[in-house]
């Protein structure tokens, strides 16, 4: 048995059909937490939800584009209709790369990196915090990155790094604002994890650096996140 019991709690997790997001959903479900999965692809959502339901909890798949105000508002409405509450919010959706010199990074690409990796986090918090404030309880976890704190010495990821650095600063600001309202806000900063958003080319290019600079000499895996609640 784990240390925590989230019976009757409801967690909303973005980017939750694979990788870190799915790992965190599984970890919470194993501690009896009901789950609302948010991602773009309905087919992948249904697959992930079916797997999580085998753990004996309720799981609502919610197709949603976290870069859209309307889509996020509609997702919130669906979740509240189903569960009547939101206790935990995990902002995991994001995308990596591209790896290129800052002078060569197109402005459109940079704006997309900021929108998905940082602005979407603000949007989700803005949308769901009122429900937490009303309940006097909430736990928000934002997935940042180690690159939001230190630069990559061999591969230029300045666009991605700046967005994740923004997530860290946003976390600090919102944590201070909500500290007296029963709501905690924290960020985790993972290292390199294989994911669809990173892509095969980036992982192959990044692996030599990861192996040289990581004591365990490996990347993270979704399984590493399955014990978050233990």
Protein language model annotation of sequence segments:
Residues 10, 17-19:
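Conserved glycine-rich cofactor-binding loop
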Residues 42-43, 63-75, 107, 224:
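The beta1-alpha1 cofactor-binding region of Rossmann-like NAD(H)/NADP(H)-dependent oxidoreductases
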Residues 96-111, 134, 154-159, 199-204:
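Conserved mid-core segment of classical short-chain dehydrogenase/reductases
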Residues 103-123, 137, 141, 167, ...:
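Catalytic Tyr-X3-Lys loop
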Residues 125, 163, 171:
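Active-site helix of classical SDR
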Residues 130, 176-180:
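Alpha-helical segment proximal to the catalytic Tyr-Lys
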Residues 145:
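Residue(s) in the substrate-gating loop at a strand-loop-helix junction
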Residues 180, 187, 208-230:
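C-terminal helical subdomain
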């Amino acid at each position: 048995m784990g240390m925590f019991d989230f019976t009757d709690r409801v967690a909303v997790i973005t980017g939750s059909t694979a990788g870190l997001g799915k790992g965190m959903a599984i970890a919470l479900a194993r501690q009896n937490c009901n789950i609302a999965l948010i991602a773009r692809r309905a087919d992948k959502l249904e697959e992930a939800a079916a797997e999580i339901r085998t753990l004996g909890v309720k799981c609502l798949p919610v197709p949603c584009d976290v870069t859209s105000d309307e889509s996020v508002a509609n997702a919130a409405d669906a979740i509240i209709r189903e569960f009547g509450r939101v206790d935990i919010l995990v902002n995991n959706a994001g995308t990596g790369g591209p790896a290129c010199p800052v002078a060569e990074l197109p402005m459109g690409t940079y704006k997309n990196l900021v929108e998905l990796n940082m602005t979407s986090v603000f949007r989700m918090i803005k949308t769901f915090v009122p429900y937490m404030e009303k309940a006097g309880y909430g736990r928000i976890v934002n997935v940042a990155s180690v690159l939001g704190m230190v630069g990559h010495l061999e591969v230029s990821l300045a666009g991605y790094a700046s967005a994740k650095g923004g997530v860290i600063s946003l976390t600090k600001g919102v944590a201070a604002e909500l500290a007296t309202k029963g709501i905690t806000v924290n960020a985790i900063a993972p290292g390199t994890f294989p994911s669809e958003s990173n892509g095969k080319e980036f992982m192959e290019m990044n692996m030599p650096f990861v192996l040289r600079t990581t004591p365990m000499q490996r990347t993270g895996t979704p399984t590493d996140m399955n014990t978050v609640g233990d």
